[in-house]
């Protein structure tokens, strides 16, 4: 009877070890995925900053062109 108890205990311990091993593997996979996603987020933030800067530059250029156009229209009105 004691032998059966030890066999059951051994089976439970082995099952616990297997579960822990699987969970550790899953944790490693999730860490890798997390790192990958963090890099993607960083890249997206960098892209966003670039686009914001480009947008600001284009807005400034648009303002310059609008001022030039207004100036030309004013000169045409004077003629």
UniProtKB/Swiss-Prot annotation:
One GO cellular component term noted in the UniProt record for this chain: cytoplasm
Highest taxon in the source lineage: Bacteria
Keywords: Cell cycle, Cell division, Coiled coil, Cytoplasm, Septation
InterPro entries reported for this sequence: Cell_div_ZapB (IPR009252)
GO biological process: division septum assembly; FtsZ-dependent cytokinesis
Coiled coil ranges: 4-78
Protein localization: Cytoplasm
Subunit structure comment from the entry: Homodimer. The ends of the coiled-coil dimer bind to each other, forming polymers. Interacts with FtsZ.
Function (record text): Non-essential, abundant cell division factor that is required for proper Z-ring formation. It is recruited early to the divisome by direct interaction with FtsZ, stimulating Z-ring assembly and thereby promoting cell division earlier in the cell cycle. Its recruitment to the Z-ring requires functional FtsA or ZipA.
Family of the protein in this entry: Belongs to the ZapB family.
Protein name: Cell division protein ZapB
Annotated organism of origin: Sodalis glossinidius (strain morsitans)
Gene expressing this chain: zapB
């Amino acid at each position: 009877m004691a032998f059966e108890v030890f066999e059951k205990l051994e089976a439970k311990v082995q099952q616990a070890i297997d579960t822990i091993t699987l969970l550790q593997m899953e944790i490693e996979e999730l860490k890798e995925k997390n790192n990958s996603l963090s890099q993607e987020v960083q890249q997206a933030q960098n892209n966003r900053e670039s686009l914001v800067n480009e947008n600001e530059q284009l807005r400034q250029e648009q303002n310059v062109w609008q001022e030039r156009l207004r100036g030309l229209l004013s000169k045409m009105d004077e003629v």
